[in-house]
């Protein structure tokens, strides 16, 4: 079981680890402070004490809001992409435009999808989905 990201004309399949790596790369491309904060999200998953976990996420979420204010809303759509549920979400064409501005000049040869498959998802495949979301006006989704 994993994540399928799809637009009107394209799709990619990834495991949850690949999806996390993809979103981490988008965070890195967005801004250094967004990247550093996004990497800390995993820390909360390691907290077993309920009160510690609640305190961590209260502070963590406040920092997300602070970052959004720092960038005067220019990164709001990117932050939405980073923090939407792993299980199911939709990004409209406006979100696609914001994400595309961050990722358009980047490419790599990392396997984000299932490496044994001939259609293993790469970053270029994700860019096609985001661009298709803009061109079609339908955005993209994952589940």
PLM regions: where:
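Acidic (Asp/Glu-rich) sequence patches and key acidic residues
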Residues: 1-143
């Amino acid at each position: 079981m994993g994540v399928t990201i799809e637009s009107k004309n394209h799709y990619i399949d990834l495991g949850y680890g690949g999806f996390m790596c993809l979103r981490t790369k988008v965070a890195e491309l967005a801004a250094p402070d967004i990247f550093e904060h996004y990497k800390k999200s995993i820390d909360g998953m390691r907290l077993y004490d309920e009160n510690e976990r609640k305190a961590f996420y209260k502070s963590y979420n406040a920092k997300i809001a602070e970052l959004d204010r720092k960038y005067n809303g220019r990164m709001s759509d990117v932050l939405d992409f980073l923090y939407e549920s792993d299980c199911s979400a939709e990004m409209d064409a406006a979100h696609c435009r914001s994400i595309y501005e961050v990722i358009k000049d980047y490419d790599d040869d990392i396997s984000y999808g299932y490496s044994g498959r001939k259609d293993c998802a790469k970053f270029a495949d994700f860019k096609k989905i985001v661009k298709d979301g803009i061109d079609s006006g339908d955005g993209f989704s994952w589940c």
